[in-house]
Amino acid sequence: MQLVQVPTRYPPAPGGVERHVQEIARRLAKRQHRVSVLTTDLYREIPWERLPPSVPRSTTEDGARVRRLRAFSFPGELHYPFFRGLGRALKAESPELVHVHTYGTNQVAVTRRFARRAHVPWVLTAHYHPIWSIWGGSLRHRLRRFYDARLAAPLVREASCLIVQSREEERLLKENGFPLPRVALIPPGYSPMRAPDPGTTFAQTFGIPGPFVLFVGRLASNKGLLPLLEGFRPLSQHDPTATLVLIGADGGMRAAIERRIGELGLGSRVRLMGYIEDERLVSAAFQEARVFVLPSEYEAFGLVLLEALAHGTPVIASRVGGIPEFVEDGRAGRLIPPEDAAAVTSALLEIWNDPALRERWGHYGRETTVPRYTWDRVVDQLETVYREVVGP
C-alpha cells in the first residue's frame, strides 16, 4: 500500500509524537508498504528553531522516504505552524491513504482538502491535549476554543477513522464537542533503547555525585516542572546526596525553571542536561535513576513512562490522561494529583526510603506492564484500520 505519514516534526527533532511516527513508519516500510513521511524542517516550535543544515531535506530512512518541507508560523500567541507546499507534495505522492498526526495543526486541513479532491481516505491520530494544558495565555486559549469549535470539529468529523491512544483521550474529545467518526483505540508501543556502553555510567559521565530523581521530556509548561522542583526540595533536605536530573530540549520553560531553582535555593542539586542525543546515555540514566517522575498536567498516553518501566525503574506520575490506563498505582509506581508539590514530596520519600519497594515496583513494570505494549502490535492494528478504510 502507498502510505503517507504527516507529522509536524520528525526525528532528529525530539518528542514523543516524533518518535511515535518514526517507529510506525519504519515498521510499515519493513512490511513492504511504500511509506513516505511529509514533515517540516523544524527542530522545535517553542522557541522556534529549525533543524541544522546537516539534516537532509529529502532522504530515505529505514526504508521510508522523508521530505522536510519549509515551515512558517505567526508570531507569539498566534503561533500556528504551516507546511509550505504540503498540498503539492501530497499530490506528488499519489497515496492510497494518508495518516496525519496531531489534530490541532494546519496539516489536518490540507490533508482533508487533498483527500476530498483525490478521493483518498485519511486517518487521524489526535495526540489531543485539552485547552487548559497547552502553553500560552488567555489569547491563545481563546483562539484554541475558536479553532476547536469552528475549524477542528468539522475536520475531525470527515476523517475516515480517528485513532486515540487512550479511552480518556476519547472521552475528552467527546466532552469538548468533537463529533467523532469511527474511533480506533491504539496505544503506542515501546522500542528497546540502545544499551549503555559497558563500563559507562550516566552519573560518572556527567559528574552526578549520588542517587538521582529523573525527568525526561520537553521543558514545557504542561509538564508540571515547577511543582516537581518544589516537591523535590524537601527530599534534598532529607538526603543531602540527592540530585534532580532534567533531560530534554527547552520547550519554553527553561528560563522559568532556572529562576525557580534559584528561588528555592537548590543550586547544584538540580542538573539541567538539555537534549541528549546519545540514546545509550539516556538509557543509562533510566537504568541508574532511583525513581522517574512525570508530573504532567496532561498526557494523552505518556510513552516516556514505558521507557522508564522497561529499565526496571519505578515511576511517579500524574493521574491524568491515559496514564492510569497502563500505570497501576501501587504496583509499578505511584499516581498523584497534577500540580501538587506536596504529593510529589510524599511519593518521592515513600520510594526513596524503601529499596524493597523500588525493586518490587520496578520488576512489575518491566516484566508485566511493558510487554503489553509493542510497536509491532501497534502496526498490526494500524494495518487493520488501513485495510478497512481503503477497502477492496
Indicate where each model-derived feature is located.
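Carbohydrate-associated surface elements
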Residues: 41, 168, 189
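Short hydrophobic beta-strand element within catalytic cores of glycosyltransferases
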Residues: 314-317
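Short alpha-helical donor nucleotide-sugar binding micro-motif in glycosyltransferases
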Residues: 156, 275-276, 283-289
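Nucleotide-activated donor-binding/catalytic signature segment of Leloir-type glycosyltransferases, i.e.
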Residues: 256-276
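A short, well-ordered alpha-helix in the C-terminal region of glycosyltransferases
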Residues: 350, 357-372, 381
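Conserved acidic donor-binding segment of nucleotide-sugar-dependent glycosyltransferases
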Residues: 329-330, 334-341, 350-355
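Nucleotide-sugar donor phosphate/pyrophosphate-binding loop at the beta->alpha transition
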Residues: 121-123, 131-154, 171, 198
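Aromatic "clamp/platform" in nucleotide-sugar-dependent glycosyltransferases that forms part
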Residues: 297
